[in-house]
Amino acid sequence: MINIKVEDYDYIMTFTSHNRASYIYQHLFRKNIQVKLVSSPNKINISCTQAVKFKEMDKDVVQQELKKNNMYPTAVYRIVRKGKNENYELVE
């Protein structure tokens, strides 16, 4: 039996375009910040197909990098897990 480790992320941020999400993902990834580029859940964003997930421990660094790169997410949500389902609480 193969055990697959699933990484838990604490936040998800959405952007106005796929290019912005991809750009900030690549930038944060190169800085060794644990991020994941994912499809935007329909529950929170229908205008862009991509979103970036990140961990609580990286929140301050992510915010600093967004400001340094003049990137502003459409919204940031806290991921709330209930069993296998994810719900989202608007943070900013």
What spans do the regions from the language model cover?
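Short, flexible turn/loop "capping" segments at secondary-structure junctions
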Residues: 3-6, 43-45
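C-terminal structural segments of small proteins and small subunits
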Residues: 60-92
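Amphipathic, hydrophobic secondary-structure cores in small proteins
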Residues: 12, 29, 33-63
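Short glycine-/aliphatic-rich beta-strand segments at the starts of folded cytosolic domains
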Residues: 4-14
